[in-house]
Amino acid sequence: GRCGCHGYKATAGWRFGNLIDGTQAEYVLVPDAQANLAPIPDGLSDEQVLMCPDIMSTGFKGAENANIRIGDTVVVFAQGPIGLCATAGARLMGATTIITVDGNDHRLGISKKMGADVTLNFNNCDVVDEIMKLTGGRGADASIEALGLQSTFESALRVLKPGGTLSSLGVYSSDLTIPLSAFAAGLGDNVRRWIWPCRD
């Protein structure tokens, strides 16, 4: 079959797209291709596998970093392609309840097909209040932020139960402000960021 990028777990890791230019090009030289590429089965079109190398792996890694366990309530903020894949990943990881947040009803409808149990349009309600009501005031076990805005990051933080896990996938254009009270609530060990990992 044809080959497609394996995603972040490939042994090249952070080098793809950061130290090796051109990974969005039609062709790219892949070091250690035997370990860093996975075959795409014959019979699948380019359109069917288009999101696998970057978008799907990013969304699924966000769900993996959220430490989701069976029985957990997970909130996924933003339902663009990466957020939708994070929603599917949360379902596959065993989340019992998945709440998705977006401002676009069409995307929220797709998120239902990807595994969401409850969808919230931020144009129609205060999503933090609504999520706290849905969780009986307890908060979510995990939240995944897939947009990259201060406001969505803050909301993802505010809906967590004490000690909950925030998995951040968004690319932020400026520095984030995180209230110190979040660390007092036990968040310090449970904020996980995947998109900009440290180099060795």
Question: What residue spans do the PLM features occupy?
Answer:
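A glycine-rich helix->loop->beta "capping" turn
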Residues: L134-A142
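Glycine-rich phosphate-binding loop and adjacent beta-alpha segment
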Residues: A95, D117, F122, L149-D200
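A generic alpha-to-beta junction signature in SAM-dependent methyltransferases
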Residues: A66-I68, T135, L147, V159-K161
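Mid-domain Rossmann-like dinucleotide-binding core that forms the NAD(H)/NADP(H) cofactor-binding site
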Residues: P39-C125, D129, A142
